[in-house]
Amino acid sequence: MKKSFLTLAFCCFAYIGFAQCDFKGYEVKAENAYTNYNVRWATGPEDAKHYTTERLRKEYLIEKVFAPGEVNWTYTLYDRFLIGGAEPTNAPLKLTSIAPLYGDESKGTSGRNLLDNRELGIINIGGEGTVTVDGKSYDLGFQEALYIGRGAKEIVVSSKNVAEPAKFYMNSACAQTSYPTKKVTLKEAKNIKAGKMEESNDRVIHQMIIDGVA
């Protein structure tokens, strides 16, 4: 739920790795022509003690977040959390639901929307783009965020300049309550100064989607 979970900060990539390796991870499946997903199961603490480096990478490293013209999701059984990236180029991309959210992948997603029982946080880390939610458009520049509440039916993302496409990093969790869709700029974020220069960790944490902000 939003009040306990959806905090999008610019340190959000702690869960994501962009390094390349030859090790084959979890199977990637296609939901439609441009939407891909993979599923990560929860890890037993005793099992994790015996993981090799390759196994750790398989379980916890998300290598493919962004790809031109694609939406890529990783669905983890930890809190049924979704981590994803959308990079629209020549055409807008509609955010559709994915089969594993419903337990039985064989039943498909016909008649279902991504946010029927979920909420979504988006932050743009690329060029200028637009997120259209049920017909209402929100322009997102670099480091601007959008919270989308439970129940939204149609979400479409697009880039304003194909040469510099938007890159929408996304988090989604289950939700029992609907909150209004809201755009958040960097200036409107809860900005927290942390660390010290002498300890090489001086930084500012920008909390974009958090209770009291969005």
Q: Would you name each region that the model predicts?
A:
Residues 1-22:
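Bacterial Sec-dependent N-terminal signal peptides
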Residues 21-86, 111:
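Generic N-terminal segment detector
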Residues 66-67, 114-116, 139-141:
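Short solvent-exposed loop/turn micro-motifs enriched in small/polar/acidic residues
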Residues 74-76, 116, 214:
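Short, surface-exposed loop/turn motifs at beta-strand boundaries within globular domains
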Residues 78-135:
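Glycine- and acidic-residue-biased ligand/ion/polar-headgroup-sensing regions
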Residues 134-150:
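Short acidic-glycine-tyrosine-enriched beta hairpin
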Residues 152-155:
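Short, charged beta-turn/beta-strand-edge "cap" motif at the junction between a beta-strand
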Residues 158-214:
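Surface-exposed beta-loop interaction hotspot
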